[in-house]
């Protein structure tokens, strides 16, 4: 409903193929829909309400759980291409013909695949804390799903720098994640997280030729947002995206890691507003 928010939007479901997708939709209808694609081992409640509610003042916001994640049924795909196909099936099931997309980390990989392989579905693309196929340091040999056992500590370390200002932003962000008190999403299983990690690692393998050829296929206006001290997806990946995407602009936020858009939420929302206009 138009008057719903991140905190109040009901969790809905729709069948697409063999998956029952869980999703939420809020904000004014009529404008170009804005689909949000999430990061590794994250569900709908892991989006920052300051960001989603900020989007929803002017945009028809759609959150969705990937197959096997949160309340969505099915088995989580272990390749980005398969995750992308699942997202396409979901979008068609809810009647989307064209939309803007925000892809955060893993979601940004899916957004790139959407732009390259399903260009007619997209109008504009926003890539947050992500990297190109075959980017730098994207195989994540040292990352394991066991690190998810203490998600709060992991988020504080991965999303925010040690500076006092960044840590204060991190504490505020962690509190915001609690703002939805009812109808919360379901935690992500290790099996599903492992599948997503496999998808990211497959994406990160450097090809033997035409390393960034896929990016040349993405003609959509694209906004790249990154933290200058990101320890999850190294900042060099943002520059690679900006160099090889034909119609991209890059914003690098200072003193920021993987949660740059949440740490700098106010200015980020202004940048997004300008970009989507």
Regions found by a protein language model. Give the residues of each.
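Short beta-strand/loop motif that positions the catalytic acidic residue
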Residues: 218, 224-226
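Catalytic active-site module of serine/aspartate enzymes centered on a nucleophile-bearing elbow/loop
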Residues: 248-277
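Gly/Ala-rich beta-loop-alpha elbow adjacent to hydrolase catalytic centers
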Residues: 103, 107, 111
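Hydrophobic, aromatic-rich cap/lid helix
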Residues: 184-211
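Conserved alpha/beta-hydrolase "acid-adjacent" motif
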Residues: 231-237
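Active-site loop/oxyanion-hole signature of alpha/beta-hydrolase fold enzymes
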Residues: 62-102, 270
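Conserved HGGG/HGGXW glycine-rich cap/lid loop of the alpha/beta-hydrolase fold
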Residues: 19-73
């Amino acid at each position: 409903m138009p008057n719903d928010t991140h905190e109040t939007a009901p969790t809905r479901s729709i069948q697409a193929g063999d998956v029952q997708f869980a999703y939420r939709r809020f904000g004014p209808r009529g404008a170009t829909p804005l689909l949000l694609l999430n990061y590794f081992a994250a569900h709908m409640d892991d989006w920052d309400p300051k960001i989603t509610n900020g989007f929803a003042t002017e945009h028809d916001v759609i959150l969705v759980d990937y197959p096997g994640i949160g309340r969505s049924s099915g088995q989580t795909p272990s390749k980005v291409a398969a995750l992308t196909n699942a997202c396409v099936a979901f979008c068609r099931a809810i009647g989307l013909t064209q939309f803007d997309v925000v892809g955060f980390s893993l979601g940004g990989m899916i957004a790139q695949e959407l732009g390259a392989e399903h260009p007619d579905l997209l109008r504009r693309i926003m890539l947050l804390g992500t990297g190109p196929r075959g980017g730098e340091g994207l195989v994540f040999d040292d990352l394991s799903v066991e690190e998810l056992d203490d998600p709060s500590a992991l988020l504080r370390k991965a999303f925010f720098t040690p500076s006092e200002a960044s840590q204060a932003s991190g504490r505020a962000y962690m509190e915001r994640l609690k703002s939805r008190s009812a109808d919360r999403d379901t935690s992500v299983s290790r099996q599903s997280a492992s599948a997503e990690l496999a998808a990211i690692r497959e994406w990160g393998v450097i090809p033997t030729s035409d390393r960034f050829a896929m990016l040349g296929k993405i003609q959509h206006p694209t906004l790249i947002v990154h933290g200058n001290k990101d320890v999850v997806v190294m900042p060099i990946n943002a520059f690679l995206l900006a160099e090889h995407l034909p119609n991209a602009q890059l914003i690098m936020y200072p003193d920021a890691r993987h949660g740059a858009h949440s740490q700098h939420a106010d200015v980020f929302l202004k940048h997004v507003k300008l970009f989507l206009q």
